[in-house]
């Protein structure tokens, strides 16, 4: 924690094509070694693939996918009297979005398709249909929270 007080929150600029801060954040999450141009190209090609396959607006499909990935509950470790408990806590809206984007990118990278454009497009399509690895991650997170509901009174 900084001594000079809270750190000012940076606001991301919306991306040039879809004019969306959410898309801009996804581009930043995908970026490796500061290569933002490459990240943008991959994302826009993925959106083209989605539009081609579904016939729907890629932005709507992406928003639906993100909605299906974002967790509502998660567990946090809390030490009480020498024992660590996994305490279920509600996820703040900002963190929900961040986790959703992170899981989407991570599980897209782990997929088997040849190019990242295809991987990302397929992961977004799977998530929009409530399937895929990112949605499974959310379900697992919710299951953990449900299983540890007995420790909910340790919330802080």
Swiss-Prot record:
One of its GO terms (molecular function) is rRNA binding. The keyword rRNA-binding applies. Signal peptide: none annotated. GO terms for cellular component: cytosolic small ribosomal subunit; ribosome. Pfam families: Ribosomal_S7 (PF00177). SUPFAM superfamilies: Ribosomal protein S7. CDD domains: uS7_Bacteria. Keywords: Ribonucleoprotein, Ribosomal protein, RNA-binding, rRNA-binding, tRNA-binding. One of its GO terms (biological process) is translation. One of the primary rRNA binding proteins, it binds directly to 16S rRNA where it nucleates assembly of the head domain of the 30S subunit. Is located at the subunit interface close to the decoding center, probably blocks exit of the E-site tRNA. Belongs to the universal ribosomal protein uS7 family. Part of the 30S ribosomal subunit. Contacts proteins S9 and S11. Interacts with VmlR. This is Small ribosomal subunit protein uS7. It comes from Bacillus subtilis (strain 168). The lineage of its organism: Bacteria, Bacillati, Bacillota, Bacilli, Bacillales.
